[in-house]
């Protein structure tokens, strides 16, 4: 009996090992397939007035939902240094703030992991807070991530007003220059079109329809010969009656008017 049980156990052992390896391979494949790069988005730089609250905005994109394993860490790299100091950590709904003096009792959580927002607020910002802030988010299995960097500038209220004035002046100047350039281009185009029409040497429609005045050709006719021929001796020439005809279509007609003298009768008395 014992020998039979041992034989069954020996036969089942390889099958069990194959089953375990299959399960592990499937789990590993599923885990590998779900791993993807988590993208963090932050503004490149922000300006905050000295003594006011500043919000460091940080959002992220992840194909996986957030949960208890999602963590957020903020670090600070002061100006002129190469190393960063971690001063804020958020995990499982809890906020952990370090003992770094510039941020003690100044930092509050302003994000919402359900909306994939990892922002924070810093109260009473001072000149010591000038530097680069680093937002790092982990959302397993999304572990491949590039942190976001924000360059924070602390400015005085007077400097900020001057900066805003220069921004407005620059914007208005750019708009005025753009409009001036556009108007100049339009005027140049209209000027060229106008002068191109003046320089055109072809015949226009009005020119084709306008009459050309020519010197009347004198063609001797019988009547003119009779009129101009000197009277023969002993003959008595009577009065010559002339008439002037106006070959026009009417007073308001657009036709060309032409007038000429026609000899209608030559009365002679012998």
Swiss-Prot record:
The lineage of its organism: Eukaryota, Metazoa, Chordata, Craniata, Vertebrata. It holds the Pfam family V-set. It comes from Mus musculus (Mouse). PANTHER family: MYELIN P0 RELATED, MYELIN PROTEIN ZERO-LIKE PROTEIN 1. The gene is Mpzl1. Coiled coil: none annotated. Disulfide bonds join 58-135. Residues 201-257 are annotated as: Disordered. The modification Phosphotyrosine is found at residues 242, 264. This is Myelin protein zero-like protein 1. Phosphorylated on tyrosine residues upon stimulation with pervanadate and concanavalin-A (ConA). Phosphorylation at Tyr-242 and Tyr-264 is required for interaction with PTPN11/SHP-2. Dephosphorylated by PTPN11/SHP-2 (in vitro). Residues 36-162 are extracellular. The modification Phosphoserine is found at residues 204, 206, 210, 221, 261. Residues 184-270 are cytoplasmic.
């Amino acid at each position: 009996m014992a020998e039979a049980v041992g034989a069954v156990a020996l036969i089942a052992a390889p099958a069990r090992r194959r089953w375990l390896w299959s399960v592990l391979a499937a789990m590993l494949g599923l885990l590998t397939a779900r791993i993807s790069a988590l993208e963090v988005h932050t503004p490149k730089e922000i300006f905050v007035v000295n003594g006011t609250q500043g919000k460091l905005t940080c959002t992220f994109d992840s194909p996986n939902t957030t949960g208890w394993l999602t963590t957020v860490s903020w670090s600070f790299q002061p100006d002129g240094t190469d190393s960063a100091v971690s001063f804020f950590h958020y995990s499982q709904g809890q906020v952990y703030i370090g003992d770094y003096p510039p941020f003690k009792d100044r930092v509050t959580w302003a994000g919402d992991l359900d909306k994939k927002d990892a922002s924070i607020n810093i109260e009473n910002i001072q000149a010591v807070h000038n530097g680069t802030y680093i937002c790092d988010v982990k959302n397993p299995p999304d572990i491949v991530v590039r942190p976001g960097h924000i360059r924070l500038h602390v400015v005085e209220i007077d400097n900020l007003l001057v900066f805003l004035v220069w921004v407005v002046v620059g914007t208005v100047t750019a708009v005025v220059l753009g409009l001036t350039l556009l108007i100049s281009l339009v005027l140049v185009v209209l000027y060229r079109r106008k002068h191109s029409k003046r320089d055109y040497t072809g015949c226009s429609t009005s020119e084709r329809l306008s009459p050309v005045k020519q010197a009347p050709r004198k063609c001797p006719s019988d009547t003119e010969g009779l009129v101009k021929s000197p009277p023969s001796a002993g003959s008595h020439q009577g009065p010559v009656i002339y008439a002037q005809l106006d070959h026009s279509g009417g007073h308001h007609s657009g036709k060309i008017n032409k007038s000429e003298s026609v000899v209608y009768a030559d009365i002679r008395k012998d």
